[in-house]
Swiss-Prot record:
Family: Belongs to the tfa family.
Record-linked InterPro entries: Phage_T4_Gp38_tail_assem, TFA_Chaperone
Stated name of the protein: Probable tail fiber assembly protein
Alphabetically ordered keywords of this record: Chaperone, Viral release from host cell, Viral tail assembly, Viral tail fiber assembly
Gene (UniProt): G
Natural source organism: Escherichia phage P2 (Bacteriophage P2)
Reported function: Acts catalytically in the formation of tail protein dimers.
Keyword Hydrolase attached: no
Keyword Chaperone assigned: yes
């Protein structure tokens, strides 16, 4: 199974490569151990999955045909075409770690950013419910049920606004 790490563009290494660069603007890609991507791509097996991952091991592309890839700035690994590997996608939620395709492990900073995004989304959703209910109350058009609903959504909104994104504990959303 092929595994080409940290593929970067570099200078041609032979006269033939130099001529191709000069005549056709070919960009040469080299793995960290000096392997030529264009030669190595021929060695990938047709019955495997090819995974491209970044410097943080996050999967950024998946294909069965290595010749379709432009791996500059990434690493490429070949893995067996088995169910567990086929579950992965390039959504950013998967990684290649310790020789295996696994669900992504988020850093504490990433988890906090996700919590901040979720907090903003929940507050926005609450405001969308609260606004028409407030209007109904202000115009003396609200039913008792709408007044009670407004109060529960306002309480929820306050509780969400107090959530610490570093250690989120989300309140239950009203019905």
């Amino acid at each position: 199974m092929q595994h080409l790490k940290n593929i970067k563009s570099g200078n041609p290494k032979t006269k033939e490569q130099y001529q191709l660069t000069k005549n056709f603007d070919v960009i040469w890609l080299w793995s960290e151990d000096g392997k030529n991507w264009y030669e190595e791509v021929k060695n990938f097996q047709p019955d495997t999955i090819k995974i491209v991952y970044d410097e943080n091991n996050i999967i950024v592309a998946i294909t069965r045909d290595a010749s379709t890839l432009n791996p500059e700035g990434f690493s490429v690994v070949e893995v067996p075409d088995i169910t567990s590997n086929r579950r992965a996608d390039d959504s950013g939620k998967w990684m290649f770690k310790d020789g295996a395709v696994v669900k992504r492990i988020y850093t504490a900073d990433e988890q906090q950013q996700q919590a901040e995004s979720q907090k903003a989304a929940l507050l926005s959703e609450a405001e969308n419910v609260i606004q028409p209910l407030e209007r109904a109350v202000r115009l003396n058009m609200a039913t008792d049920e709408e007044r009670a609903r407004l109060e529960s959504w306002e309480r929820y909104s306050v509780l969400v606004s107090r959530v610490d994104p570093a250690n989120p504990e989300w309140p239950e959303m009203p019905q």
